Structures are given as C-alpha cells and as structure tokens.
C-alpha cells in the first residue's frame, strides 16, 4: 500500500470534520435539535451523540460510495490509485458500520421511555427495538449492508466487484432516507425519494472530491494525468450538483411550506445550506472554466492552486454536511405527525399516510400530480443525454434517424407522466388505475424505448477509453455483452419472465409489498420496465443482441403472449376473491366502484388495453420479417449481377446431365 495514502486520507478527513463539527454545533444550537426532552430525557450524550454519529454515517458512506464511483468510472484499473480507492472505500464503509451502531444505540436511548440501564433486560429490550420497530430495523439493515460492503471491498479487485459493492453501498442509504423528517411527513413517498436521491448524489459529490484529493496528495500524478482525473470527476460533480440542488429544493418545499416559514430556525438553517451550495457551485464553475485549462496547458503550479481550491471545497462540504445533520434534528414548520398517531385518522390515512383524494376522473391522469423526484430526474437526464448524443452525431456528419429520437423522447415523457401524475396517485386507491399504469410501464413505454436504440446511439456518440478505465460506453457495452443479460435477453426466456411475472407478482406478497412500502413500489416500476424492455428488445430490438431467432418463432411468441394476457385478464374479470383485501378493501372509499368490481374492471383493462401494444409488436415483427426478406433478395440480386447465379447454373447442369444433354458453352 502507498505509504502516503493514510496521511492523505487523514488530511481529507480532517478538512471535512472541521467544517462538519462547527456547522453541526451551530446548527444544533440554532435549531434546538439537542435541547433536553420534556419526558424521559436521555442526557446530553445521546442528544448530541445521535446527530454526530449520524453525520459520521453519511460521511463514511460518502467516502465509500465516492471512492467506488471513482474506481468504476474515473481511474484506470492499471493505476495504483485504483487499489487506493478500494482501501478508502473499505475505511469509509467501516466507518459507516461503526457509526451506525452508535446511531442505533443513541436512537434507542432517545425513544426508550425508561432510563437505559445495562441490566439483565437490556439485551431483550434492545433486540425488541432492533427487530420490532421500523427505526430499529432500518438501522439494522444499514449496519448489515455497510458491514457487507466493508468485507466485499477488501476481497474484490474487479470492475464487477466494484459495481456490486457500489450498489450495496448506495442501498445502505435507503433505510436512512425513510427515517427522520421523511418518516413523519404527510408526503411520505415524495419525501423519501427526494431524501434518498439527495443522499446518494451528495455522497458521490463529496466522496469523489475526497478521492481526488487523496490521489493528488498520495500519488502525486503529473499535471496531464491529474487533469484527466479531475475532468472526469468534474462531469460527475456537475450532475451531482444539479441533482443535490433539485432534491434539496424539493425537501425544503415539503418541510417548510409557506415562504414566511423561512424566517423560522429551520428556514435559517436551510438558507445557510443554500449559501454553502451556491459557493460549492462556484467552485465547480472555477474548475470547468479555469483550473482544468491550466492543468491541460501544463501551467507551472496549476496543480498546487487546484489543490488549495479542493481543500477549501472539502471544508465547505463539511459545513454543508453538518448543517444537513442539524436540520435532521430540527423541528420543521410543516407538522410531522404520522397517521397512526392522529387522534382521528381515516382508513386512507392509516394505510397510505394521505387523505383520500377526490373522486377519480380520467382527466386527472394529466391534471393531478405528485412529484416522484427520482423518476423525474431519470426522465430528464435520459432525454438530455439522448438528445446530446443525437446532436453530437449530427455535428460530425453522422446520420441518426429522427424517428428513433422521437420514440425515445416519447417513451420518457410517458414514463414521467405515469410515475408523477394521476396514474401514480390513484393507482394506490383503485386497482383499475394501477392496471393502466402497469400496462403502460410494461408494454407501451418499453416498446418506445427499444425503438430508440439507446445502446447503438451510446456506442457511436460516446468516445471510448484507452487507458484501462471504464466510462459510460464501456459499462454499457459490458452489460449488453454479458452472459447474464444474454441469457435473460433470449426471446423464450424474456417471454417467460414477462408473462410469468404477472402471476407471481399479483398472486404473491410482492403486490402487497409494492402497495405498502415505497421501496416495493420503486422495485415494481423497475421490474415492469425491465421485463417489458427485455421482451420488446428480444423481438423487435434495433440494438445488437446475441440472439437472432427466426421470425416465425418471434410471431408465435407474440401470439402466445396475447393469449396469456387474455387468460390473466379473464381470471381477474371472473374472479370472486379480492387481491390484497387488507388494502383495497379497507381503504374506506365512498366513491367509485366497489373494490371487487374495480378489480374486475382492472381485468378488462389488462385484457383489452394490453392487446394494443402486443398488436403493435406483432405488426413490427411482421414488418421486420418483410424487410429482412427484401434485404436478403437485394443481396442475392447484387451477387448474381457480380458473379452470376451459381446455384441456378449448377441446378441446370444437373438436369442436363440427367437428360444426357452436353453442357452448353458459357458466354464470354
């Protein structure tokens, strides 16, 4: 291991910790987040210990996620800095694990109504807290995932291992997003999505810059090499800045409410965090406008100047992190009372945390909105990057069909509407509306996205790398050509997954999980999109695929899928048992059809509406078949024009030989 690595990491940690500690103490004093509790006060150690430990949890997560991101997207696997990034990731994940243990204990001390005593009942009560309460289970999951990341990072040295460890590190932040202010707010699902998105991209931003500093101070790369690292990180930092800003505004909007509430203690801390974010954005602009150019030109002292800016930025990031931890312990202007604690709660509030919306009308599919920031950002960035790819090809004179761009943009717009508008809102209360969203997510949107040929565009528009690192192009092509996706992308396998998942999802606890838990809801959307995309790609995909089944087989698969959809729809239409009766049957709706009739309406939608995309698939398969035959005939005609019809000549010679007729002399 590089002997300068630990001193460099210590310097980075010190810079972050200085800003974090100062901002946290000032924030707790301003917002009253560490004031003694009126009942069963656990003491100052727990009151100050919880926000401090939680801040270290996020700091450790930033180090692990940011370092793994740099290894996956920035650093060459041949470079010594690659191994250093994994060491930093292991240290960060270990810090997250230990800090999560302390956070879980301090949370237990605060919510436990009796003074904590280490007697014979302590273990029993602690385990009841960890296994029997939502907040306890959340901390337990975070501890387990962080510990797993620590072990995994120590063991792996491959890109695949880095990718898996990175996913687990990101997943460890989800339980934290469901705690704090997001747990009690009325807009629970938008708050959780915004908090999770904010945490992940803040971790990428902070941890990535920390790794840049570690590389500069421990490996001392030449200016040109450091320019490559910093320029790649700068692009990631720009995206992270935009996402952190958007998610921060969303969080503030959900918790501050009226503009006058900005004069509260919570509003003052939000304003301070906005100032820190603006200053960090200015530092990012300085990188992209001046410092990177100086490094590229080899200006003497440019690396030293850049690192002074990096050091100041790290301290400022610590300030922003400290303010965030203080905000998490500060009372919000918008009251946060879970529905289960309301004196009088409606069935809808108990189940969903929200009041029952007005009676549904189909116009509300467009007029009713509830922001899901995660999917809104995915849609925006997917459109922006696709259009950028199209324009980049056009700029260098390469043609790209406009129809593909229209298909991709249309699919993404429909995805944004489906996840953020009326279908997403009312699907929670009406099975029929949920089924409309299902058909669109699994059939209409994937077909449009497949026709956009995103892999082909990415392979043409994104420059490849030659230094042993993996950029977006390398990751996309590696995924496309992996054996795993090759197996899942086989038409028969994709068809089985697409059809069988209907039965498995709706007639298992998965459906209940998707309704009751926001994580389950997000998984449901991803599953519908992924299974539909694999199915459509295997049949009519433009992007390269290892499988090229004959067109008659493709048509048979489409027809079989239509039959399976009809069977599924009929089972719902004539079924007399209610799916998830403890949800749809207990919602307390006084408008619309009764739950069983609504479910039967959903069956009609699954049968009728689902046939339109399937019919479109069948038409596209037939059209592709026809075009394939035309291309084959044209190739044959060109070959005949060039060398003659050798097959026909051989056949005629065989007939003449059988008839005893001598061969005719060839012309020319």
What are these model-derived regions, one by one?
Residues 1-668:
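Alpha-helical membrane segments of multi-pass proteins
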